[in-house]
A protein has these predicted regions:
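Glycine-rich segments within core transmembrane alpha-helices of 12-TM secondary carriers
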Residues: 38, 58-84
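C-terminal membrane-cytosol helix-exit motif in multi-pass small-molecule transporters
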Residues: 84, 117-137
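Intracellular juxtamembrane helix-capping segments at the cytosolic ends
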Residues: 39-53
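Extracytoplasmic gate region of multi-pass secondary transporters
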Residues: 151-205
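Hydrophobic core of transmembrane alpha-helices in multi-pass small-molecule transporters
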Residues: 9, 23-39
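Helix-to-loop junctions at the C-terminal end of transmembrane segments
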Residues: 1, 201-210
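Juxtamembrane intracellular "pre-TM" segments in multi-pass secondary transporters
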Residues: 132-157
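C-terminal ends and interior cores of transmembrane alpha-helices
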Residues: 4-20
Length: 210
């Protein structure tokens, strides 16, 4: 269900970017809904450790996190490709136009959201049918709420905000940095390399921790 819920912001973003009059608050709400994916990612990090012995937990966590971070690179690689073609026209909106050096260009920004919907639906069906849930790991909210009283939990949360939050921030800022420092270079062709290197490096950290 958490995977399926990601279809809401994917469709919402595809609709919102077609109207230049869309209020900023709408994009804030859509961004918050995208956080449902972050919640699924966090739960998978807690879940994957049950499938590996203690001596391999670091590598398991790193591989799982690396695959999650890889999504940033996949998005930055895919979005420039799909927004440049009439992938869903005329079903899901007309292209937007802009002028560059006196030449009119067309772009389909909505494709960056709509393109993920089939994959989200397929993943949701696969999870519903074949996910290996761990019955012994179930606990009530009261059982889980004990973590709020543990100082190490707060320390690790703060540390995680600094590390994973920095990764997301650097991935978002990299295109702007390239555009500002190298104005003659098209950043859309290279920005995916930044998060790609970060994602591929995570398994190394897991191996070292083991």
């Amino acid at each position: 269900l958490s995977t399926l819920s990601l279809a809401i912001p994917a469709v919402g973003i595809g609709m919102a970017v077609q109207d230049t009059g869309t209020p900023y608050v709408v994009f804030v709400i859509l961004a918050l809904l995208c956080g449902l994916g972050g919640g699924a990612f966090a739960s998978s990090m807690a879940n994957i450790g049950f499938f590996f012995p203690k001596a391999q937990k670091g590598n398991a966590l790193a591989l799982n996190a690396g695959f999650g971070n890889l999504g940033v690179s996949v998005l930055q690689f895919t979005a420039p490709l799909v927004t440049g073609i009439a992938l869903f026209t005329p079903l899901f909106g007309a292209p937007q136009t802009y002028l560059e050096n006196g030449v009119q260009h067309q772009v389909w920004l909505q494709n960056a959201g709509f393109v993920w919907v089939p994959f989200i639906l397929a993943a949701a069906v696969a999870a519903w049918v074949g996910m290996n849930d761990i019955a012994s790991a179930k606990a009530s909210f009261a059982d889980q709420a004990v973590i709020f009283k543990r100082k190490h939990n707060w320390l690790m949360c703060w540390l995680y905000i600094g590390t994973f939050g920095s990764f997301i921030g650097f991935a978002a800022g990299f295109p702007l940095l390239m555009k500002g420092q190298f104005p003659d270079v098209d950043p859309s062709k290279y920005v995916f390399f930044g998060p790609l290197v970060g994602a591929l490096a995570r398994p190394v950290g897991g191996w070292l921790s083991d």
